[in-house]
Amino acid sequence: ADTGVITGNGFIIDVQDVQQPVKGLSVHRAVVREGEVHAGADVVAQVDVQRRRDGEKAHSGTHIIHAALHQVLGNEATQRGSFNKEGYLRFDFAWNEGLSESAKREVEEVANLAIRDNHEVITREMPLAEAKALGAMSLFGEKYGDVVRVVEIGGEFSRELCGGTHVGSSAEIGSLTLLTESSVGSGNRRVEALVGLDSFNHLAAERTLVNQLTGLMKVQSSADLPEKINQTLAKLKAAEKELAQLRREKLQAEAGKLLENAQTIGSVRVLAHDAGELDANGVRELALDLRSRFGSEAAVV
C-alpha cells in the first residue's frame, strides 16, 4: 500500500499504510509527526511517489514470475500467495518438489525476456465471467465481485485479476534476479526475487565477490573457479587426514609413557589423559592400544 504525508494547518501526519477493510472505505494507519489534528480540517495528501514506483516494479514482477512459472512448469503451478515491496517479491505456488537449477535458470530467463521485450501493461474492468473466459488467472480461494479488474502484461503472456498498481510497460522493471526457491509446506514452494535497482546491486555485489575469489584462487577466469575450489578442498581434506594420522601415531608412540602416569586407586589402576586433539576414531584407536598394554588386567574405557 502507499505511504506518504498528510499536511494541514498546524499539523503533519506520516501515513504508514492504507487498507480497505470493506469496499468503499479506505483506512489510513498513520502517526502524527507534529501538531494536533482537528476533525474537518482541510488537508493535502502527498504520496511517496518513488516508493510507489518501486512497489509497482515488484508487483508487476510478481505477475511476470507467475507467468514464467506457468510457461516452464505448466498450469499446475498455481498461485498460493504473494508479497511484494520496493525492490523485492516472493511468490508461493503449488508444486510438489524443488526446482532443478536448470528450471530456475529458465524461469529467470523467461521473466527477464518478458521485461526486455517491453510489453505494454494494460488494465481493464470487465464482468467476472468475461475475465474467466479470457483465461485471467485468479488467486486461489479469493472471492470476487461481478465486475473485476484485469491486468494484462503482453496480452496473453500474463493476464490476472488484480486491483493493485503496476508499471506502464514491463521494461520499467529493469531486471529480475531469483534469490531462493524453497518449501513452504507440503505441496507448496516459494521463490524470492529482487527487481530494479535492488536486482542490479545484488548482481554487482556477486560480481565483486566472484572477482575477489578469482584473485584469491589465482585462476584466469571465473569459469575455472569450481574446478580450482574442488581441487583445494580435496587437498585440504587429504592434509587433515594426514595430520590426524600423525597425531594418532604420536600418541601411540607415547602410550607407554601414558601408562607410567597411571595411578592406583585401591586395587584399580586409573589413567586420565586429555586427548582433545584427536577425533572420535583417534580416541578409540588410542584406547584400544592402551588396553592391549594392560596385559591380563581388565580394562574399562
Language-model regions, residue ranges each:
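A glycine- and charged-residue-rich anion-binding loop/surface
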Residues: 1-301
